[in-house]
Swiss-Prot record:
It catalyses: NADP(+) + 2 CoA = CoA-disulfide + NADPH + H(+). The lineage of its organism: Bacteria, Bacillati, Bacillota, Bacilli, Bacillales. FAD binds at residues 8-33, 267-277, 419. Its EC number is 1.8.1.14. This is Coenzyme A disulfide reductase. Pfam families: Pyr_redox_2, Pyr_redox_dim. Keywords: FAD, Flavoprotein, NADP, Oxidoreductase, Redox-active center. It comes from Staphylococcus aureus (strain N315). SUPFAM superfamilies: FAD/NAD(P)-binding domain (SSF51905), FAD/NAD-linked reductases, dimerisation (C-terminal) domain (SSF55424).
Length: 438
């Protein structure tokens, strides 16, 4: 009976193990998870903090006991894989509760250890990061126990923006700082102005080109010379792959610690796969490498690896499109395709429209800004971005499908919109992009 070992029990690992069991009722499957919880919804965590998700239990899909009862898959939490011997096909596991170590053999090994939050490294009892449900509980308990009011949020990526919004909606008083003037880097820089407008509208303080110089209790000294007091600090300064334990093996890592994989999510070592935040692949629509540490990619990779292990060796990954979206107060920011800083590798043109998300005469209309970049050599779409109070998600998903099928910008004129006044226009914004590009 084949033995399958999975490292990591969140989006990628737990999903992959579950899909393998659906296809293969006999294999022995065991998952090692170094932290307390398995199968929690990472994307729900800011909303748990903001009490939008009313009970944290809704962010936790399974416990190890429930997972075993439903799927006959063993999950060992607080068990950290600390080394891989790919020649003997074993992993070394540390029981973090007892500090005991043991070896576990495998026939197939699936690596889905995820990533960890970066930290600025200050010694501080009021500083937190947000990466898992344990972090969420710690933040929530600290807020309640210390009657937290003023919170400093560091960083201006998706997670920091979501955390800030949820702290504000909870009734706290957040302040945002960011070390540069380039916020929300997945979006075009000039499309991010509504973020600052939303902060101004609510009189939420923010400072760009600002960093912490020192923390002394609740007193924060900044590089600008300002000294302010905060009850709590939440750092959102990026992540790094949990790949340190892989260095003991023959598995290839890139310079940032990610694992390059092929279209079957195989590593360079036989019988070892990598999925989720730790794996790097390529774009679907252009010939460039891509790392997209988001939920869709982890789930898609999990399904492909499960099919492979179950015997379907014809299924392959066709690449990422990098579709992403975030809500920040009243606005939605969405984009798909290559990142803004990757456009320079192409000879491209840009076309954009700004008009109401639905028919102008229908109540509640608001402007939607839609932008598309296309390759001048073949007129295929390289990237699209949308910002507005409604309709951004719909347009970006349509453009994602267009890019998936390598449509040209001109073919957007042929998109047949589901039109009614509350939803769109007879000639939708997507159609108008195509007409303007001609």
């Amino acid at each position: 009976m084949p033995k399958i070992v999975v490292v990591g029990a969140v989006a990628g690992g737990a999903t992959c193990a579950s899909q393998i069991r659906r296809l293969d009722k006999e294999s022995d499957i065991i998952i090692f998870e170094k932290d307390r919880d398995m199968s929690f919804a990472n994307c729900a965590l800011p909303y748990v903090i903001g009490e939008v998700v009313e009970d944290r239990k809704y962010a936790l899909a399974y416990t190890p006991e429930k997972f075993y009862d439903r799927k006959q898959i063993t999950v060992k939490t607080y068990h950290e894989v600390i080394a891989i011997n790919d020649e003997r096909q074993t992993v070394t596991v540390l029981n973090r509760k007892t500090n005991e170590q043991f070896e576990e053999s495998y026939d197939k090994l699936i690596l889905s250890p995820g990533a960890s939050a970066n930290s600025l490294g200050f010694e501080s009892d009021i500083t937190f990061t947000l990466r898992n449900l344990e972090d969420t509980d710690a933040i929530d308990q600290f807020i309640k126990a210390n009657q937290v009011d003023k919170v400093l949020v560091i960083g201006a990526g998706y997670v920091s923006l979501e955390v800030l919004e949820n702290l504000y909606e909870r009734g706290l008083h957040p302040t945002l700082i960011h070390r540069s003037d380039k916020i929300n880097k997945l979006m075009d820089a000039d499309m991010n102005q509504p973020i600052l407008d939303e902060l101004d509208k609510r009189e939420i303080p923010y400072r760009l080109n600002e960093e912490i110089d020192a923390i002394n209790g609740n007193e924060i000294t900044f590089k600008s010379g300002k000294v302010e007091h905060y009850d709590m600090i939440i750092e959102g300064v990026g992540t790094h792959p949990n790949s340190k334990f892989i260095e003991s093996s023959n598995i290839k890592l890139d310079r940032k610690g990610f694992i390059p994989v092929n279209d079957k999510f195989e590593t360079n070592v036989p019988n070892i796969y990598a999925i989720g935040d730790i794996a790097t692949s390529h774009y679907r629509h252009v010939d460039l490498p891509a790392s997209v540490p988001l939920a869709w990619g982890a789930h898609r990779a999990a399904s492909i690896v499960a099919e492979q292990i179950a015997g379907n060796d014809t299924i392959e990954f066709k690449g990422f499109l990098g579709n992403n979206i975030v809500k920040f107060f009243d606005y939605t920011f969405a984009s798909v395709g290559v990142k803004p800083n990757e456009l320079k590798q192409f000879d491209y043109k840009m076309v954009e429209v700004t008009q109401g998300a639905h028919a102008n005469y229908y109540p509640g209309n608001s402007p939607l800004h839609l932008r598309v970049y296309y390759d001048t050599s073949n007129r295929q779409i390289l990237r699209a971005a949308a910002v507005g109070k409604e309709g951004a998600d719909k347009r970006i998903d349509v453009l994602s499908m267009a890019m998936m099928n390598q449509l040209t910008v001109d073919e957007l004129t042929e998109f047949e919109v589901a039109y009614a006044p509350p939803y769109s226009h007879p000639k939708d914004l997507i159609n108008m992009i195509g007409y303007k590009a001609k």
